[in-house]
Regions:
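Conserved HGGG/HGGXW glycine-rich cap/lid loop of the alpha/beta-hydrolase fold
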Residues: 2, 7-66, 70, 84
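A structural alpha-helix within SAM-dependent methyltransferase catalytic domains
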Residues: 48, 82, 110-113
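Catalytic nucleophile-loop/oxyanion-hole region of alpha/beta-hydrolase
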Residues: 65-77, 129-130
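Conserved acidic catalytic loop of the alpha/beta-hydrolase fold
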Residues: 75-93
């Protein structure tokens, strides 16, 4: 199993912890709430033979810093994801987001579509987007 490269990427007043391993197109894995980069460790090890797999601790979570006194927005977190894509790769990525991470992936696709080659959204809490039943 490949040993991940661990680093912190500075973005807008935060130090975002990320780890990446493997070679190939960038595959950014965005975790949900109450998780961190470690959530994807097993999957990252398996996928690293085909991709450069990147996972990270979202702003103000686990090993990442940030100003907890300021409201965090999905837009801010999408900019954090974009900064990681730019720092580790060539400005484009396949993105997989789970739960709250899926919302970040959707925001990234809506506001910076040029950064996304493909987006997989898993368990996105988007109930407000559904029609009234």
């Amino acid at each position: 199993m490949p040993t991940p490269i661990r680093e912190k990427i500075s973005n807008e007043g935060a130090e975002i912890y990320c780890e990446h391993r493997g070679n190939g197109p960038i595959l950014l894995l965005v975790h949900g709430g109450m998780e961190d980069a470690g959530y994807y460790s097993s999957a990252a090890d398996i996928l690293a033979d085909k991709f450069t797999v990147v996972s990270y601790d979202r702003r103000c979570n686990s090993r990442s810093s940030g100003d907890r006194s300021v409201d965090m927005t999905v837009t801010q977190q999408a900019r954090d994801a974009a900064s990681i894509i730019n720092a580790v790769g060539d400005g484009k990525a396949l993105v997989v987001g789970r739960s709250g991470g899926a919302i970040i992936g959707l925001e990234l696709a809506a506001t910076m579509p040029e950064m996304i080659n493909f987006l997989i959204v898993h368990e996105a809490p988007v109930i407000e987007l559904l029609p009234q039943i």
